[in-house]
Amino acid sequence: MFVSRLAASGLLLLALLALSLDGKPVHQSKPGRSPPISPLSAQQWMPEGRPPHPIPPLSVQQWSQGRPRSEVPPVVVQPHESPAGGTTAFREELSPGPEAASGPAAPHRLPKSKGASATSAASRPMRDLRTDGKQERQKWGRMVQPDHHAAPGGGGGGGGGARRMKGLAKKAMGKGCFGHKLDRIGSTSGLGC
């Protein structure tokens, strides 16, 4: 259907192109000779043969005098104590030191533990931006297949998986076909099965 509309509009354009403005068909000229075409007024130069505004020459950058200064601080190499406390190892940090953020008077503090608290605080902003986490995928899977546990097999009282129905999936089990969530933004079905 779309192709026929496209073809019809193309034929209409060809028919309109064949007609001139006063309704007469366009006379095709002889192939040997073409009529002279006058230049557009925008393409005409001044009588001197130069453009009306002077074009400045290109400026060449001199790199032989040294590299340009950049605002990016260099890589900071800081000593890092191991949790055992005996040896000191060097590590490279790509982030600027604490004096760059809060001034030279700020004391340097290393995290007391190298475990989850140091990494969780640093990765919290990225975790907050993540929309499709592991928990969301699990919830979505339970909403899509609420009768997943009905099949035989697996451990425990049900079958299939070892998880119990919780939250929205448990509420949706008794409703039948109405009110099931269709997607993650909260649209629910109002139609039957």
Curated annotation (Swiss-Prot):
Residues annotated as region Disordered?
25-173
Residue numbers bearing the Pyrrolidone carboxylic acid modification: Q28, Q65
Q: Where is the composition biased (Basic residues)?
A: 163-173
Query: Keyword Disulfide bond on this protein?
Result: yes
Q: Name one GO biological process term.
A: vasodilation
Q: Which residues form the propeptide?
A: 24-27, 40-43, 58-64, 75-169
Q: List the disulfide bonds.
A: C177-C193
Q: Which UniProt keywords apply?
A: Cleavage on pair of basic residues, Disulfide bond, Hypotensive agent, Metalloenzyme inhibitor, Metalloprotease inhibitor, Protease inhibitor, Pyrrolidone carboxylic acid, Secreted, Signal, Toxin, Vasoactive, Vasodilator
Which PROSITE patterns does the record associate with it?
NATRIURETIC_PEPTIDE
Name the organs or tissues of expression.
Expressed by the venom gland.
Which segment of the chain is annotated as a signal peptide?
1-23
* Bias type Basic and acidic residues, positions: 125-150
Primary location = secreted
Q: Which GO terms describe its molecular function?
A: hormone activity; peptidase inhibitor activity; toxin activity
Q: Which SMART domains match?
A: NAT_PEP
Bias type Low complexity, positions: 95-123
Q: Where is the composition biased (Gly residues)?
A: 152-162
Q: Where in the cell is it found?
A: Secreted
Task: Please provide one cellular component term from the Gene Ontology annotations of this protein.
Answer: extracellular region
Known function: Bradykinin-potentiating peptide both inhibits the activity of the angiotensin-converting enzyme (ACE) and enhances the action of bradykinin by inhibiting the peptidases that inactivate it. It acts as an indirect hypotensive agent. Neither synthetic Tf1, nor synthetic Tf2 show bradykinin-potentiating effects.
State the similarity comment.
In the N-terminal section; belongs to the bradykinin-potentiating peptide family.
Q: What is this protein called?
A: Bradykinin-potentiating and C-type natriuretic peptides
Which organism was this protein described from? Protobothrops flavoviridis
Q: What lineage is on file?
A: Eukaryota, Metazoa, Chordata, Craniata, Vertebrata
